[in-house]
A protein has these predicted regions:
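Canonical Radical SAM [4Fe-4S] cluster-binding loop centered on the CxxxCxxC motif
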Residues: 95-132
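P-loop NTP-binding catalytic core
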Residues: 85-99
């Protein structure tokens, strides 16, 4: 069976050509799929024989809501979607003055092993298909009734560990006959998969790259982020400099503030040193408590921010949304897995 929603318009055109169908079928079906139909029978401008033929050879992905939490504080909505194979993924809808942002997952689970993150506790199960990435944006918009204007790939999983499917998703969601979300309204976060950063630079995509740094020295970073053993801090920053030189786009560096681990003044000084010659924005993140993690939130966020700014580094503190729900990455999925006896 063919995952028809993972096809681009060009691929659909070839698909229908091979079926002996006219070229305009591609746009028809593409448009229906990106409206969120769950079956071919809903495609009422196709003949019944064609709909039956498609149903025999193709399937349409469509997740169901396993859990849903809405914050009474700020309206943030956390979705736990159940996929066709029973696996669950998380999506978060956040409301800002500049529009609605959806934070999506790129994998079922994660194999990166960051010590302070709930997403990686059960490891990686599988990659998400392009259609399953798209569905998170599409069905969040349909369920909430709120138009989505921005996407961040910062949910469960490492996007650059699922590179081909993520690139296909970007093409799909950017299509003028689909959701038509511009690349400049999309952010992609990586824990530092250097070959993926170089591949993105070569493609000259106009998205915003965010790098989960969390420590500027390899000793600390290797302790909390195993990926650093494959691509150490020096290798990572070299790739970031190459990315800026090729794209001209500023990188955002995510920095979860961990008490006594990465919140020292000398680490702020090291960040400033490594950013020299490259514009960068450091986004300081108040750490979320994870039951299985020994790490605690830093009490020096304000002081660390002031130190960075005194060194000429642009630094902001991320606004925490959904504080009264399981809005941080991996928490709701973990709760579901515990209740299913999978943890």
């Amino acid at each position: 069976m063919t995952d028809i929603k993972s096809m681009t318009e060009r691929q659909l055109a070839d698909f229908f050509k091979n079926m002996g169908q006219p070229a305009f079928r591609a746009k028809q079906v593409f448009t229906w799929l990106h409206r969120g139909v769950r079956s071919f029978d809903e495609m009422t401008d196709l003949s019944k024989p064609l709909r039956a033929q498609l149903a025999e050879t193709c399937f349409i992905t469509a997740p169901t809501v396993a859990r849903k939490q809405t914050s009474k504080l700020d309206g943030t909505v956390k979705y736990l979607w159940e996929l066709a194979d029973g696996n669950c993924i998380e999506t978060v809808l956040m409301q800002y003055h500049h529009g609605n942002t959806v934070c999506i997952s790129s994998q079922v689970g994660c194999r990166m092993g960051c010590a302070f993150c709930a997403s990686t506790i059960a490891g990686k199960v599988r990659d998400l298909r392009p259609s399953e990435l798209l569905d998170q944006v599409l069905f969040t918009q349909l369920d909430s009734g709120m138009p989505v204007s921005n996407i961040v790939l910062m949910g469960i999983g490492e996007p650059l560990d699922n590179m081909d499917n993520v690139l296909r998703f970007l093409e799909l969601v950017n299509s003028p006959h689909g959701m038509n979300i511009g690349m400049r309204h999309i952010s992609l976060s990586t824990c530092g998969v250097v070959p993926g950063i170089d591949a993105l630079a070569d493609r000259q995509l106009q998205l915003t790259l965010s790098v989960s740094l969390h420590a500027p020295d390899s000793e600390t970073r290797s302790r909390i982020m195993p990926v650093n053993r494959a691509y150490d801090v020096e290798t990572l920053f070299a790739a970031c400099h190459r990315y800026f030189q090729k794209t001209g786009r500023r990188i955002s560096f995510e920095y979860a503030m961990i008490d006594g681990v990465n919140d020292h003044d000398w680490q702020a000084e090291l960040i400033a040193k490594k950013l020299k010659g490259m514009p960068g924005h450091v986004n300081l993140i108040p750490l979320n408590d994870v039951v299985e993690s020994p790490y605690k939130p830093s009490r020096r966020i304000g002081a660390f921010q002031q130190k960075l700014e005194s060194l000429g580094v642009t630094a902001t503190v991320r606004r925490s949304l959904g504080g009264d729900i399981d809005a941080s990455c991996g928490q709701l999925r973990r709760k579901e897995m515990q209740e299913r006896g999978q943890l």
